[in-house]
Amino acid sequence: MRILFILDSVENPTSANVLMAQRLAGVLCAAGHAVHLLELWDGLHPQPELPGCTVHCLAFADERLMNAALENGRSGGSPIPVRLARLCCHPTAVAAAFRQLVLHAPRRVLDTRRELEKLDAAFHFEVICAVCAPYRAAFALETAQVQAKKAIWQLDPYASNRDYQAPGGYPRELELLNHLAAAFITRQAVGDYAPGAPLAAAAEKVHVLDFPSLVPPAAVPNHAADSKKRCVFCGSLYPGLREPGFALELFRALGLASGWTLTMAGGGWQYFAADAAQTKAVLGEQFEQPGPVPAETARTMQAQADVLLNLGNAVDNQLPSKLFDYFAAGKPVLHLCVIENDPALPYLARYPLALVLHQGQADAADILHCWLGEVCGKQLPFGEVCDLFPELVPQAVAAEFVRWLM
C-alpha cells in the first residue's frame, strides 16, 4: 500500500502526536508498505530522519513567529497590545495573522492542499492520512483534489477538546468527517459517536486505533548505585489541563532529606513560574527543569530514571500517550490524579509497578515516601509489558490501521 502521512509540528516541535505517527510509519515501512511523510514544520526544528520513508517538507516559520508573538491565543499571559507590538516586529508574522484571523485562509492550509495535490499526482497514493491535532492538515486534505482515500488519525479530539474552543464545533467536525473515507480515534472519543451523540451520523466511518507506544526502552548504562535517585517527568504543561502543582507540592513535602531529585522536562513552565520558584527554594539542585527535549533524549531520561511521573489530565476524554511510553520503559510509575474519572486509571490498574495518588489526599506524601523506598530499583522486562498491553505493540496497531483501509 502507498501511504502518505501528514505530520504537523509547527506549534510543538516535540509533539507526541508526531512521534506516534512516526512510529506507525516506521512499522508500516518495515512491513513492505511504501510510506511517505509530508512534514509541516516550524522552519527551526527539523524532525529526525525516518529510515525507509520518503520525506517531503513544508516550512512555516511565519506561523511560528505569529504563534510566539500572540502566545497561541491563550488567555492570561501578556496584554493584547504587547502581543500585537511583538507581532509587528515580524512582517511575515503579520501576513500570517492577516491570512488566519481576517481572511480565515491560513497559509498552512492552502499550501498543504496544493502540496497534497502535487504529491498525489506524482506518487498515486492509495491512502493519505492527516495526523491530528493540529487540524490544519485535516482541513487541507478535506478539499484537496486527490485520488487517494482520505483519512485522519485523531490523537486529540476537535470539537470536544476542552483545552480550546474549536471553530465551528461539532458541525464543523461532522462536515470534515463527511469528506473522509475513515477516521481513527482514541478509545476516549468513542462516546462522541454513540447514538444521539453529536457525531453519531459519522459513526460508521470511525475506528479505534491505539497508541503504538510499546517500543524497547533506550539502551543506556544504569547510573551508579550511590548517585541521586531520579523521578522524571517528560511532557508539556497546560493551564487547566495538565498542571504541575500537585507534584511540586508532594516533592516539597518530601524535602531534601528524601534524597530524590525531581526532573521535569518539557515546555509550559511560563504559566507556573511562581510554583516552580517556590519548589526550587525548597529543593535546590534536587529540582531540575531542563526544558523541552527531543524524543530520543526523553527516552534516555526515562530509561535512566528510577521512577517516572505522570500528571493526570483534568479532562476525561484525552489520555497522554506518554503514559504508555513510561510503561514501555518498565519503570515504576507515579500517577497523580486530579479528577475521579481519569481515563488513565484502567490502564494503571493493569500495571503492577504503579502508584495512583489523588489530589487532596491527606496522607499522599507519606504514602509516596513509603512507596518510593519499596519500588526503587525495580523494573519490568519489556516482554512482560508487551504481554500486559498487547494492543499497544506498534505491529498490532499497524495491522489495525491497514485492516480498516484495505
Residue ranges and their predicted role:
Residues 23, 107, 117, 136, ...:
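Membrane-proximal helix-turn-helix segments that form the acceptor-binding/catalytic region
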Residues 266, 273-297:
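Nucleotide-activated donor-binding/catalytic signature segment of Leloir-type glycosyltransferases, i.e.
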Residues 178-206:
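A short, active-site helix/loop in glycosyltransferases that binds the activated sugar's phosphate group
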Residues 1-65, 182, 214, 252-254:
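N-terminal subdomain of nucleotide-sugar transferases
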Residues 116-137, 151:
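Short N-terminal targeting/anchoring amphipathic segment
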Residues 43-107:
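A conserved catalytic-core segment of Leloir-type glycosyltransferases
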Residues 223-242:
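Conserved donor-binding/catalytic core segment of Leloir-type glycosyltransferases
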Residues 303, 307-389:
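Catalytic binding pocket for nucleotide-activated donors in carbohydrate/polymer assembly enzymes
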